[in-house]
Amino acid sequence: MANMARHGSPKLAELTALTEFTLAKPMQSMVHELLSQLGPELPDRPQIIGFGVYIWNVIQTTELVRALKAQRPGVVVVLGGPEVSHEIDSQEIVHLSDHVISGWGDVSFPKLCLALLQGPKPLMKIIQGEQPPLSDIELPYREFSDADLANRVLYVEASRGCPFKCEFCLSSLDKTAWAFDLNPFLQELDILFNRGARNFKFVDRTFNLKIEASAQILQFFLDRLATDSAQGLLVHFEVIPDHLPDRLKELISQFPPGVLQFEVGIQSFNEEVQQRISRRQDNAKTEANLRWLLTESNAHLHTDLIFGLPGETLQSFAEGFDRLLNIGPQEIQLGILKLLRGTPLARHTQAHGMVYDSQPPYVIRQNNDIDKESFERFTRLAKYWDLVANSGRFKQTLPLILQAHAPHHSPFWAFMSFADDLWQQTQKTYGLTPEALVDAVFTYLTVSRLFEETQVRQFLLKDYLASGARGRPMCLAHENLPLGGERLGSSQQNLRERQDRHADLQK
């Protein structure tokens, strides 16, 4: 939206509207809303709809484009986004559309719309997106409404691109990272803050790449924290784990609890796997920096591991998980490898027997080192780990679940045993109520692991009360519990409560 005037025309900007849908919205409702916004068809006046297409919405967007074309064949459909920027000709949604912008669309989309409306009309269906200097891109932040500021996490970017070449990531196709001019960017952040914005998520792939810029951004938020108006501030950065010089440490250490969240991609501690996928990571520095952040700062650490990388065995992943768990980040996100269109990861398919789903999100199902059944077990484990560990709802009970036992004597395998048991009990990974989950944990620990019932019940009672749930699990039926149903807040409130539960655990 912000660039429709700058790279199109003021009139084009006036004619443009931004519309958002959820994946759950009925198809015909979306079609009706879009066609109503366009109004009736008029001779010699093209009607244009642009779609951002991603791995998570391409199926629904394909259906929507098909329905739009069926009801109004003359509408001009323009596609953009990462999912249609690679392997373009093989996709059904591309065949249904009129134009596709591959790559950056900030400049190319306004220019295309202007050409469609005023001529000369473009001859090519596939348009390579123009990558301008970042100074030529209008920052979009003044487009945010007051409702956006009050109810949403605000996505902001101080830079684009990534200099690293991790083969599973689309950013590996970038030649380098490009930084927006810092002064105008900070001015826009200041305007957002003064309008009431308090929840900022930086989408930079490598926030701590350029230390001078990183330091100025951190200082910007420290300065706001020194005022009385910064209540509720939450800032999320994605950082590379082995690059944390003293200047950044000095600034990070000044933040109070509940403000900083760092997403830290570890992906794998296996050095052979790292080399195979062109990932540069100093494991010793990574571990040292994580331990420093946990002991010397108040940052909340959301760390990532990827299961299924070429050459990673189940045992080597388990060892990496145990190593990361021992370091002690508040959250460990267990991701499953996906073959994103255009990534160099595809070069390993034959040599490592990589088998992926043919439909989005292209999740791996088996390879030469890990069979299909093990992938299915791990998929369940990852979902249960998020429910039990990452949620912070079982901080008293989790150590019992993770107690290593024969035959593997490993926290990873201990949780795998729990996940297998939970699956046998419930046959589901979604839709588990807090009460059903508490009862399943109780059954596992007392029946399968033979822990003393009184001890387990005591831990579960503390966890259940601290979680804010208000039901009555069967195993706690004789305890004094408040009633009224679980409290559900906004996503921002839930994120804050999740961090608070982890913060309490560290006290």
Where are these regions (language model features)?
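A general structural detector for well-ordered alpha-helical segments in enzyme core domains, enriched
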Residues: 1, 34-37, 60, 64, ...
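Alpha-helical structural signal in soluble globular domains
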Residues: 3, 7, 67-71, 96, ...
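Radical SAM enzyme core and accessory elements
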Residues: 35, 42-45, 382-507
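Conserved C-terminal portion of the radical SAM core fold
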Residues: 10-12, 48-50, 186, 191-203, ...
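Radical SAM [4Fe-4S] cluster-binding motif and immediate context
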Residues: 139-297
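Short aromatic-enriched loop/helix-cap "lid" or pocket-rim segments at secondary-structure transitions
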Residues: 113-114, 137, 214-215, 248-249, ...
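Acidic, low-complexity intrinsically disordered segments
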Residues: 1-186, 191-195
